[in-house]
């Protein structure tokens, strides 16, 4: 039974991402999770502009300046008997593409909700994405050290707006200045809250049982009585936790706490490691691949440039689907049809990188990329598979980009193509002129591109408005028809960063007319990598 150690390693893995609306406290939760995983000694809370103490997971220049997480970091740490891979996703509303792709690489998600605000727009969008793969969701109601909405109302809102059943695991006692702690329904115990302990793991003060007189003495008779009454209601009206429904993405366990006060995060982590699935099978075009298969397979879901300003490098983030990575192993780079020798893959602790000696199904490793790896690429040890479902979206916003110094056109193009390969932005080169058009899903992406062109490629660029409303990738099985379409639509055609033919429409009316005139041509709003 030589593969017992391998199976044990795979079953320990828990790979998840955090989804939330901007400012719901995601970066703070990431910090505290790392603190409990003993990955960092003290939590540096994210401060406003220019503060010197930055959250461990926000490490690019612009993120440090603005206090928002723009790129997906990967952090690995042990917790209980598991090895947890946490993928930190951009919380800012603009970064849906990067976030979306990250959600294709995880087996479960932690949804963080600001308990003062409830379900917000961004959370809805991200939940739609997790629905596509029925990803199991754990919920953390955050910011109980502030005044919050009624907890029952919050559960109702999650159920009705996100269409998922809620099973409360803990229940808050008071909130804001009156916040006293939580009652853990499964353990039948009250965990008391102490203020001012946000940077370290505090000793827990626990009161066993709901009818314990110590509870009244500690939190006050009124709050204790309120807790008992609320629990009677909650237990009568809400769902019990059901593992099977959770794994199907139909029910979410709900925890209450405050990430800033470092309270309740461990209960949520306990739930996540106990209940969330070990690495799941993944669908390839040819067949489903099980995590426990001994042959290595993996796919690239993100490329990031210049993680190390000292080295002009790019790292391709790969989710291992099955098997084991060992240093120096040979694998097939399926799209290019060639064997590669991977000797220097890295593992992550947000911006700190260490060489991976071995990594297993469920883990994320980084491959050094010198321009040959693209998002969606599959690597295998033998079988020629292609993992599916890593999409590119047609951008919704467009601008022309121009140089302050015209002599740097070559660097500009190189920078833009690299940034587009990494998914930071999309680039379109019209066939009829030398313009460069940048397409994004959100406004902030434009700022990121200019900032990164300056700091990483030493290119000063500015934007101008451009008459483009939308873009569609063009496909047609009939070469003659495609040729006719290209001849008649020269002014609206461009090549994207990967040289795919794209139709750039000045208005939606124009796009609809083109579709009517050329019914044989497909105009696609998404394109799989």
Swiss-Prot record:
Residues 11-280 form the tr-type G domain. One of its GO terms (molecular function) is translation release factor activity, codon specific. Pfam families: EF-G_D2, GTP_EFTU, RF3_C. It comes from the Bacteria. InterPro entries: EF-G-like_DII, EFG_III/V, G_TR_CS, P-loop_NTPase, PrfC, RF3_C, RF3_dom_3_sf, RF3_GTP-bd. Keywords: Cytoplasm, GTP-binding, Nucleotide-binding, Protein biosynthesis. Belongs to the TRAFAC class translation factor GTPase superfamily. Classic translation factor GTPase family. PrfC subfamily. This is Peptide chain release factor 3. It comes from Vibrio vulnificus (strain YJ016). The lineage of its organism: Bacteria, Pseudomonadati, Pseudomonadota, Gammaproteobacteria, Vibrionales.
């Amino acid at each position: 039974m030589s593969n017992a150690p391998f199976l044990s390693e795979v079953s320990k893995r828990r790979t998840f991402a955090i989804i939330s609306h901007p400012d719901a406290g995601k970066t703070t939760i990431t910090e505290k999770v790392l603190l409990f995983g003993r990955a960092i000694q003290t939590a540096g809370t994210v401060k406003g502009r220019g503060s010197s103490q930055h959250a461990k997971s926000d490490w690019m220049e612009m993120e440090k300046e603005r206090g928002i997480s723009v790129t997906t970091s990967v952090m690995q740490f042990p917790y209980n008997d598991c090895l947890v891979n946490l993928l930190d996703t951009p919380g800012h509303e603009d970064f849906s593409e990067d976030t979306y792709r990250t959600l294709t690489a995880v087996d479960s998600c932690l949804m963080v909700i600001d308990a003062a605000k409830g379900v917000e727009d961004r959370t809805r969008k991200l939940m739609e994405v997790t629905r596509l793969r029925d990803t199991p969701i754990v919920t953390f109601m955050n910011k109980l050290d502030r005044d919050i909405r009624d907890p029952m109302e919050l559960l109702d809102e999650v159920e009705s707006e996100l269409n998922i059943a809620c099973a409360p695991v803990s229940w808050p006692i008071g909130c804001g200045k009156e916040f006293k702690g939580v009652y853990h329904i499964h353990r039948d115990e009250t965990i008391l809250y102490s203020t001012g302990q946000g940077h370290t793991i505090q000793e827990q003060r626990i009161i066993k049982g709901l009818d314990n007189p110590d509870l009244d003495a500690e939190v006050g008779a009124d709050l204790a009585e309120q807790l008992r009454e609320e629990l009677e209601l909650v237990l009568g009206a809400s769902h019990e936790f059901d593992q099977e429904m959770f794994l199907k993405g139909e029910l979410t366990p709900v925890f209450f706490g405050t990430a800033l006060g470092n309270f309740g995060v461990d209960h949520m982590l306990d739930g996540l490691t106990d209940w969330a699935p070990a690495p799941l099978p993944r669908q390839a075009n040819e067949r489903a691949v099980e995590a426990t298969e001994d042959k290595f397979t993996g796919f690239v879901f993100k490329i990031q440039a210049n993680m190390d300003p000292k080295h002009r490098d790019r790292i391709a983030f790969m989710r291992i689907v099955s098997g084991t990575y060992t240093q120096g192993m040979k694998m097939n780079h399926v799209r290019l049809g060639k064997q590669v020798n991977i000797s220097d893959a890295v593992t992550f602790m947000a911006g700190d990188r260490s060489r991976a000696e071995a990594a297993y199904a469920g883990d994320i490793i980084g491959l050094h990329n010198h321009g040959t790896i693209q998002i969606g690429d599959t690597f295998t040890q033998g079988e020629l598979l292609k993992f599916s479902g890593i999409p590119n979206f047609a951008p919704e916003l467009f601008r022309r980009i121009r140089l302050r110094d015209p002599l740097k056109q070559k660097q500009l193009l190189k920078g833009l193509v690299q940034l587009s390969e990494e998914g930071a932005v999309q680039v379109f080169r019209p066939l009829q002129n030398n313009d460069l058009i940048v397409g994004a899903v959100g406004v902030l992406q434009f700022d990121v591109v200019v900032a990164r062109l300056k700091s990483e490629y030493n290119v000063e660029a500015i934007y101008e408005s451009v008459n483009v409303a939308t873009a569609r990738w063009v496909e047609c099985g009939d070469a003659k028809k495609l040729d006719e379409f290209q001849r008649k639509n020269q002014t609206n055609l461009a090549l994207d960063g990967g040289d795919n033919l794209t139709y750039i429409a000045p208005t939606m009316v124009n796009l609809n007319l083109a579709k009517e005139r050329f019914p044989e041509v497909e105009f696609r709003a998404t394109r799989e990598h």
